[in-house]
Regions:
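Helix-turn-helix
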Residues: 33, 37, 43-74, 78, ...
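C-terminal peripheral helix-coil segments that are non-catalytic and often amphipathic
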Residues: 1-18, 119, 123, 155, ...
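Amphipathic alpha-helical segments used for helix-helix packing
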Residues: 118-144, 158, 229, 328, ...
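Short, basic, alpha-helical segments at the C-terminal edge of helix-turn-helix-like DNA-binding modules
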Residues: 81-88, 305-313
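Hydrophobic alpha-helical connector segments
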Residues: 78, 92-127, 176, 205, ...
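Amphipathic alpha-helical packing segments from all-alpha helical-bundle domains
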Residues: 130, 140-167, 176-180, 184, ...
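C-terminal structured domain segments across diverse proteins
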Residues: 310-314, 331, 338-435
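Conserved hydrophobic residue
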Residues: 47-48, 170, 388
Length: 438
């Protein structure tokens, strides 16, 4: 795999090359200064940032803040609107350029568009967080905005991929709309430090695109071979042991409350669900629920830990299996596909925690640092053995990218099903979607 810097040297930032992300900014006005302050605070403190904190950081009284925005939601709406305007501009500009003469290689065009999307996501980190980890809100306009898919960039990516197929670069059996959606969602994740950390957006975007296009595996593995691996069997063995916590015994109050809370959080959303709602659904008094599980934050932490332990069991079993690094990477993707399919409520609740955490949090979630160490070790083993194409100088950056790619977006999983989602993961992580040179 080529180094992430290879195609970006000597070129202007991708956001300038495609679509000019940030043109919507009307710097100099007091309103814009407040928006910049709010975005900076949310990036460092998360969505729990209050109006009082925004006013203090902007150097104005809270009352003066209301002259510009009548609520915190109004600030969030404006941040999201500007973010979406910049994404649309990138997509529209890229689509317009598709009709222009361009002799550059197909992967360079895909990487350029991906980098532009990634840079826009980094620039609008606070808005990205609200859109990427969308959650219920009492404000209908905010809900509508966060649920709008970035159609312009998806269409631009789809048309770029179609041009790549016409040229013979993209494999004929790859579903291009699904791939375009996947690439765009992946590029937007670059705006979150869990993917990018200390690397530049251009570096990470190029690395992600090269993994998706070329694959990690030095030799392209077949589905039948991967299905027969010891690692895949180990993953299935753990998946079969996963219990459905919704079937908790009502006599076990703690387990019963946790099971009810999962369903209520998944149905209503973490932010808007109250302890009173959980108590009512569980048929218990509010005081009893508080005694059993403590605060809502403690309940969220407990649910996250339970979900993380299920995934951890799969990782441990796969990594201990007698299998190659490529087979283990495949089996870990299968663990993730099944975890998302079986425990979608828990996954959405985990996103609620992500919404409350700053987008520059580098190691979110339960046991992420452990997963990162394990992935670095697995990738290093594969590179030494010649099974995995050599990545960038930083194994940490490669590991963060691979962990992110192994989680299929839920909308894609629901649309295609578990088996097709696994094949998609194999195509975009191991084999690559581009035709390999013989």
């Amino acid at each position: 795999m080529a180094r992430a810097e290879s195609l970006t040297k000597g070129r202007p930032p991708a956001a300038v090359r495609v679509g000019q992300a940030g043109v919507a900014d009307d710097s100099g006005t007091r309103r814009t200064e407040i928006l910049h302050t709010a975005a900076s605070l949310i990036a460092s403190s998360g969505l729990r940032t209050s109006l009082q904190e925004i006013a203090d950081a902007a150097g104005i009284l809270p009352g003066s803040l209301y002259h510009h925005f009548d609520s915190k939601e109004a600030i969030l709406i404006e941040l999201i609107r500007r973010y979406q305007e910049d994404l649309n501009r990138i997509g529209q500009t890229a689509q317009a350029r598709l009709d222009e003469p361009d002799s550059r290689p197909v992967p360079e065009k895909i990487i350029e568009l991906g980098s532009a999307i990634a840079n826009c996501a980094v620039q609008h980190g606070a808005a990205l967080q609200m859109s990427f980890y969308e959650g219920p809100s009492a404000d209908p306009e905010l809900m509508k905005l966060t649920q709008q898919p970035p159609m312009a960039i998806q269409e631009a990516m789809l048309q770029t991929l179609r041009a790549g197929r016409w040229s013979g670069y993209i494999k004929p059996d790859i579903d291009l709309p699904t791939l375009a959606d996947r690439i765009c969602q992946t590029m937007l994740q670059v705006g979150l430090a869990v993917m990018r950390h200390n690397s530049s957006a251009d570096q990470v975007a190029e690395l992600l695109c090269r993994i998706i296009l070329q694959g990690l595996a030095a030799r392209s593995p077949t589905d039948s071979a991967l299905d027969r691996s010891n690692a895949f069997a180990a993953a299935n063995g753990v998946i079969e042991t996963w219990a459905d916590d919704r079937d908790a015994n009502p006599s076990d109050k703690a387990a019963h409350v946790l099971a009810v809370a999962r369903m209520e959080f998944g149905r209503r959303g973490y932010e808007v669900t109250t302890i009173r709602d959980i108590a009512s659904a569980a048929g218990l008094g509010t005081g009893t629920v508080y005694r059993v599980i403590g605060s809502k934050d403690e309940l969220l932490a407990s649910i996250m830990e339970s979900f993380g332990r299920k995934v951890e069991a799969g990782w441990v079993s796969v990594l201990r299996s007698d299998a190659t690094p490529v087979e283990k990477l495949d089996a870990l993707s299968w663990v993730n596909v099944n975890a998302l399919d079986r425990f979608s409520d828990e996954f959405r609740i985990q996103l609620a925690w992500m919404r409350q955490s700053p987008p520059n949090t580098p190691n979110p979630g339960w046991l992420y640092a452990t997963r990162l160490r394990q992935m670095k070790s697995l990738l290093s083993e594969g590179i030494r053995a010649g099974e995995i194409s050599a990545g960038p100088p930083s194994t940490t950056m490669l590991a963060r990218c691979v962990i992110g790619l192994q989680w299929i977006p839920e909308n894609i999983l629901r649309a295609v099903g578990k088996r097709a989602a696994l094949v998609h993961a194999r195509d975009t992580v191991l084999r690559g979607v581009a035709v390999r040179a013989k």
